[in-house]
Swiss-Prot record:
CDD domains: AAT_like. One of its GO terms (biological process) is L-histidine biosynthetic process. Its EC number is 2.6.1.9. This is Histidinol-phosphate aminotransferase. Keywords: Amino-acid biosynthesis, Aminotransferase, Histidine biosynthesis, Pyridoxal phosphate, Transferase.
Length: 350
């Protein structure tokens, strides 16, 4: 018998969105990737780095990438840590803050991977629900768990919490509030200023969505230097390879390209939302690069299968709270036009 830890043997694990090997034969709208390529400057930086210098270890501190992030976000580099995807930061925050039997919390529905990461550490998981108006329910006036994860904008629903609400929540926690801003570049507000105002707020970002670098696995966190120092103690000492560091620095430096990609996605999101509503779909106003939409018959499974049969991938969740709808990533205008055409063919249902 292999001597696995009991909690590892019993846990279900996280299931990511379907990634077909023949990806180019699909319209892929199921994992919130960017429909546009990375900045040409990113590709140039990667090509320049992909030489004989790869025999050398990368900079363990990711200094050039952190310096570019400092310019973009307005923080000293000592407040920033680069990561192998924002998931690495989320994992290390749990490792740093929540021991076996200690509690972490998050809103359900949101990013369920928080729970998986906590299970690995043997931490207890507590979830709080949402009202029909998307107000969190049941959070105590003073919550003493070790970590509280808040996905803002929410995924998979796309709505945002106000900065006033987030500040109030930070003041009610004895532990760390992690504001997961994976999709914030498609929204209007960020919690970065709360990092300066509260010593228990951490903001995480990813390069997978707005910077078109899902394939590189890049992320970062911004927090007080003492939190960053703790995370640096437990991360892989060479957590970003040379190519990833070059890509991150170049992506952050090319803000005009980044802003134009975001503009086009937001424009397409508005158009697609209006088209869905004309078809009778209920669409939650979204601040992400996706929308959550329910068909007139509230049969998300029917629409998911119908789109799949037409080589269009979207995300359907089996959670009863979500099964009536679909999360649909915002692709190019052409991809979304083909998706609307397919939805018209599928009709409103019974």
């Amino acid at each position: 018998m292999i001597a696995l830890r009991e909690n590892i043997a019993e846990m279900a694990g996280y299931v990511p969105g379907f990634q077909p090997l023949d990806v180019d034969s699909y319209i892929k709208l199921n994992t919130n990737e960017n429909p546009y390529p990375p900045s040409p400057k990113v590709l140039e930086a990667i090509a320049k780095e992909a030489g004989e210098g790869l025999r050398r270890y990368p900079d363990a501190a990711s200094r050039l990438a952190r310096e570019e992030a400092a310019k973009v976000y307005g923080f000293d580099p000592s407040w920033i840590i680069m990561a192998n995807g924002s998931d690495e930061v989320l994992n290390n925050l749990i490792r740093a803050c929540a021991g076996e039997g200690e509690e972490i919390a998050f809103i359900n529905p949101s990013y369920s991977y928080y729970g998986t990461l906590a299970e690995v550490q043997g931490a207890r998981v507590r979830t709080f629900g949402l009202s029909e108006s998307f107000e969190p329910e049941g959070i105590p006036e003073h919550y003493d768990g070790k970590l509280f994860f808040l996905t803002n904008p929410n995924a998979p629903l796309g709505f945002t919490y106000s900065q006033r609400y987030i500040a109030d929540l930070a003041g009610r926690l004895s532990g760390v509030l992690v504001v997961d801003e994976a999709y914030v570049d498609f929204a209007e507000e960020t919690s970065l200023e709360l990092v300066r105002s509260f010593d228990n707020v951490v903001v995480t970002r990813t390069f997978s969505k707005s910077y078109s670098l899902a394939g590189m696995r890049l992320g970062l966190a911004i927090a007080r230097p003492e939190i960053i120092a703790a995370l640096n103690k437990i991360r892989d000492h060479y957590n970003l390879d040379r190519l990833a560091q070059a890509a991150a620095a170049a992506a952050l430096a090319d803000q005009p390209y980044f802003q134009e990609c975001v503009r086009k996605i937001k424009e397409t999101r508005a158009w697609f939302t209006a088209e869905l509503q004309q078809l009778g779909y209920q669409v939650i106003p979204s601040s992400g690069n996706f929308v959550f939409a329910s068909p007139p018959d509230r049969d998300g499974t029917r629409i998911y299968q119908g789109l799949y049969d037409r080589k269009i991938l979207v995300r359907h969740f089996t959670d009863p709270k979500l099964a009536h709808g679909l999360r649909i990533s915002i692709g190019s205008r052409e991809e979304m036009e083909q998706t609307v055409k397919a939805l018209r063919e599928l009709g409103p249902g019974r």
